[in-house]
């Protein structure tokens, strides 16, 4: 009896391990790996340990975070590869990772390299720089040759553009040039508000294989109810993307500590995956930030793999080809009370000209300009529409978004999602200044100190130099309505 049980477990484990393999036509489960965002000394396993788990189809090495145009780029894999630089360079030599890449590929798991990330310094000043960098990437990581290949003779399967900051200049030229070198999987990781502030024009210009849409740290997160906007991305994939067969990945946090907001437990995520896969033929699976978080989250990784592949198998290809319905749950960009005198009802179907513009209706719903027509949708349960609760500020150097994640009993929680729009990253010490209404009082933030005198707020942050950051705030409102900070008052220094 004991022998039978052991044999059964062994066979089950073998079957599971053989199931994990990348599918070009079906769904996949992708994990970002390398940064050990869980933060513990033993929270991140080796690359090969994930590839042999039977619960990963694609691994994304994170990150190549410094382009260093005119020289060699830099990679950062946290504790997975440290202080082993090629002589007289800042480029890591990681032979163990290289060996693991080849083992992963022999098991059918694709290995990609992510360019960018929140921390680093990257971007192009021209298309020619993008084309030159494509040659660099091909020689260092692809099928080219170089004396300074970080992973030796291992050849990655593609790249992921996780461009959190900078400008869009040069990326379309980079992708086009890299495509000309040979077969590479190429994707991008835009944030879910549509269109993405930096990658929007890039993904409209060149055909990609997938987009890892970040459905977290934004109002359109997977956990936001009717604000979740996968339908908008499906619409883009089918009607505007140069590659009409592009896969839209549902990118989520691997645990509650993996992101500032937007985490959905596996119990919550299961029905969402089943719903998305049944409605949208562009659905390509689930991507997770990151492996260290998911593997330390009470079986999240194993249940997720079963959910994604189980939903796909149960549904079958015929059901997956069902046309997606008319948009009814478009992303909202704000949460605040509405006055019909100030925010008149914008009737669904009427013409509009400002893509993605959002306003509240007099009934407490919200309406968004979607491809020339106003579309109205209800707010999530327990939430009312606040037309001024998000402020968007774009100056010459920063694009910032302020939105409310909860508002009840006079208390609120909010997020500032800031992205650099130049090639120079934010410095280690940062200051944010803005003006709030008289009845709003900020009390806490996760990265620094809040100083408020009357309506004037100053937040001093101490963080790593980075291209983007997410700041969690909380405070109180002595009013029944929340009004956002004045967009014209935002200052970043």
From Swiss-Prot:
First-level EC class: hydrolase
InterPro entries: CBM19 (IPR005089), Cts1-like (IPR045321), Glyco_hydro18_cat (IPR001223), Glyco_hydro_18_chit_AS (IPR001579), Glycoside_hydrolase_SF (IPR017853), Glycosyl_Hydrlase18_Chitinase (IPR050542)
Organism of origin: Rhizopus niveus
Disulfide bonds: none
Leader sequence residues: 1-20
Domain GH18: 27-318
GO cellular component, one term: extracellular region
GO molecular function: chitin binding; endochitinase activity
Catalyzed chemical reaction(s): Random endo-hydrolysis of N-acetyl-beta-D-glucosaminide (1->4)-beta-linkages in chitin and chitodextrins
Record flagged with keyword Hydrolase: yes
CDD domains, per database record: GH18_hevamine_XipI_class_III
UniProt entry keywords in alphabetical sequence: Carbohydrate metabolism, Chitin degradation, Glycosidase, Hydrolase, Polysaccharide degradation, Signal
Documented EC number(s): 3.2.1.14
Family the UniProt entry places it in: Belongs to the glycosyl hydrolase 18 family. Chitinase class III subfamily.
Positions annotated as active site in the UniProt record: 164
UniProt-listed GO biological process terms: chitin catabolic process; polysaccharide catabolic process
Protein name: Chitinase 1
């Amino acid at each position: 009896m004991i022998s039978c049980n052991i044999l059964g477990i062994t066979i089950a484990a073998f079957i599971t391990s053989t199931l994990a393999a990348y599918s070009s036509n079906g769904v996949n489960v992708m994990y970002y790996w390398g940064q050990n965002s869980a933060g513990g000394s033993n929270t991140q396993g080796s690359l090969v340990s994930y590839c042999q788990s039977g619960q990963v189809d694609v691994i994304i090495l994170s990150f190549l975070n410094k382009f260093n145009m005119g020289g060699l780029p830099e990679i950062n894999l946290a504790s997975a590869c440290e202080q082993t630089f090629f002589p007289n360079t800042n480029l890591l030599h990681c032979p163990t990772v290289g060996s693991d890449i080849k083992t992963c590929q022999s098991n059918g798991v694709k290995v990609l390299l992510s360019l960018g990330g929140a921390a680093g310094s990257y971007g192009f000043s021209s298309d020619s720089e993008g084309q030159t960098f494509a040659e660099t990437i091909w020689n260092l990581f692809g099928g080219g040759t170089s004396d300074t290949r970080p992973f030796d003779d291992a050849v990655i399967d593609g790249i992921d553009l996780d461009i959190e900051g900078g400008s869009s200049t040069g990326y379309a030229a980079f992708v086009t040039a890299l495509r000309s070198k040979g077969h590479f999987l190429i994707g991008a990781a835009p944030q879910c508000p549509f269109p993405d502030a930096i990658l929007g024009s890039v993904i409209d210009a060149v055909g990609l294989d997938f987009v890892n849409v970040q459905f977290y740290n934004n109002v359109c997160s997977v956990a936001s109810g009717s604000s979740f906007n996968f339908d908008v991305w499906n619409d883009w994939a089918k009607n505007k993307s140069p590659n009409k067969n592009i896969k839209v990945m549902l990118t989520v946090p691997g645990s509650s500590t993996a992101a500032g907001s937007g985490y959905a437990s596996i119990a919550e995520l299961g029905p969402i995956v089943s719903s998305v896969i049944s409605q949208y033929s562009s659905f390509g699976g689930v991507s997770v930030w990151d492996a260290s978080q998911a593997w330390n989250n009470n079986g999240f990784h194993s249940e997720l793999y079963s959910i994604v592949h189980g939903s796909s198998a149960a549904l079958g290809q015929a059901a997956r080809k069902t046309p997606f319905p008319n948009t009814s749950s478009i992303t909202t960009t704000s949460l605040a009370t509405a006055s019909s005198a100030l925010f008149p009802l914008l009737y669904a179907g009427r013409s509009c000209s400002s893509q993605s513009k959002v306003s509240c209706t007099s009934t407490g719903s919200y309406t968004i300009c979607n491809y020339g027509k106003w579309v109205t949708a209800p707010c999530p349960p327990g939430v009312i529409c606040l037309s001024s609760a998000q402020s968007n500020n774009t100056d010459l150097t920063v694009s910032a978004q302020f939105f409310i994640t909860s508002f009840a009993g006079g208390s609120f929680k909010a997020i500032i999602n800031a992205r650099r729009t130049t090639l120079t990253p934010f410095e280690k010490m940062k200051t944010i200044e803005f003006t709030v209404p008289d009845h709003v009082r900020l009390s806490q933030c996760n990265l620094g100190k809040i100083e408020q005198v009357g309506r004037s707020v100053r937040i001093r942050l101490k963080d790593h130099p980075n291209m983007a950051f997410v700041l969690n705030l909380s405070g109180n409102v002595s009013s029944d309505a929340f009004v956002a900070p004045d967009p014209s008052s935002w200052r970043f220094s």
